[in-house]
Amino acid sequence: MTGFGLRLAEAKARRGPLCLGIDPHPELLRGWDLATTADGLAAFCDICVRAFADFAVVKPQVAFFESYGAAGFAVLERTIAELRAADVLVLADAKRGDIGATMSAYATAWVGDSPLAADAVTASPYLGFGSLRPLLEVAAAHGRGVFVLAATSNPEGAAVQNAAADGRSVAQLVVDQVGAANEAAGPGPGSIGVVVGATAPQAPDLSAFTGPVLVPGVGVQGGRPEALGGLGGAASSQLLPAVAREVLRAGPGVPELRAAGERMRDAVAYLAAV
């Protein structure tokens, strides 16, 4: 079984170092002349799947599907399946975090044997990094990945993430714990990544980190694609910029969406060349 870290590296090499977001916000649906219903959600996702089929990674924002209940989850299941059928890696942006049996259930849902299972999922470590163990174990057993929140772009996050813990920031502690988990898993590209926002007030030190780094917040949210190189001292090849609204606002036309994605992919292509 090929681990997620290697599959991600191969996908980036073939299709470029970019993660495109599917964020079906009600305002976007209305802007695309779609109803804010499960049917409108399905139409939105169908357009995105067609436009994004040639990109490396696509990240559906799970919260926008949850708001439509069972029908929304049905759309998400279909979207994940269609993207994976197109050889796109799917990163479910679910930000799950819990303990014990509940964390195990989330693990089965998102990176185990489940219709919702994606290639990777985002997770919150703020119940203690050890609480993620069931998720990390299930992901590893199925060749899937986990991206752990470390330093986010929202201003509220700094109060926790920049707080001192054992002489380092909490965000740095998370990075170091993820790094240790990757090293324990053996050689090769790490399958556990961290999330560091493009506009995070203070990026942790990533110079010794060997896993992938998801970098959301590029584009409309203020992150500049040309300024990502060297983030936290990470190797440029580790970075995976994530873009949603900057591209989605080009819709609803499939050619226009695809072209917007290609422009952003071109803007971050230098990350793969280093």
Curated annotation (Swiss-Prot):
<keyword id="KW-0665">Pyrimidine biosynthesis</keyword>
<dbReference type="InterPro" id="IPR011995">
    <property type="entry name" value="OMPdecase_type-2"/>
</dbReference>
<dbReference type="InterPro" id="IPR018089">
    <property type="entry name" value="OMPdecase_AS"/>
</dbReference>
<dbReference type="GO" id="GO:0044205">
    <property type="term" value="P:'de novo' UMP biosynthetic process"/>
</dbReference>
<keyword id="KW-0456">Lyase</keyword>
<dbReference type="GO" id="GO:0006207">
    <property type="term" value="P:'de novo' pyrimidine nucleobase biosynthetic process"/>
</dbReference>
<protein>
    <recommendedName>
        <fullName>Orotidine 5'-phosphate decarboxylase</fullName>
        <ecNumber>4.1.1.23</ecNumber>
    </recommendedName>
</protein>
<comment type="pathway">
    <text>Pyrimidine metabolism; UMP biosynthesis via de novo pathway; UMP from orotate: step 2/2.</text>
</comment>
<dbReference type="GO" id="GO:0004590">
    <property type="term" value="F:orotidine-5'-phosphate decarboxylase activity"/>
</dbReference>
<comment type="similarity">
    <text>Belongs to the OMP decarboxylase family. Type 2 subfamily.</text>
</comment>
<keyword id="KW-0210">Decarboxylase</keyword>
<dbReference type="Pfam" id="PF00215">
    <property type="entry name" value="OMPdecase"/>
</dbReference>
<feature type="active site" description="Proton donor">
    <location>
        <position position="95"/>
    </location>
</feature>
<dbReference type="InterPro" id="IPR011060">
    <property type="entry name" value="RibuloseP-bd_barrel"/>
</dbReference>
<dbReference type="InterPro" id="IPR013785">
    <property type="entry name" value="Aldolase_TIM"/>
</dbReference>
<dbReference type="InterPro" id="IPR001754">
    <property type="entry name" value="OMPdeCOase_dom"/>
</dbReference>
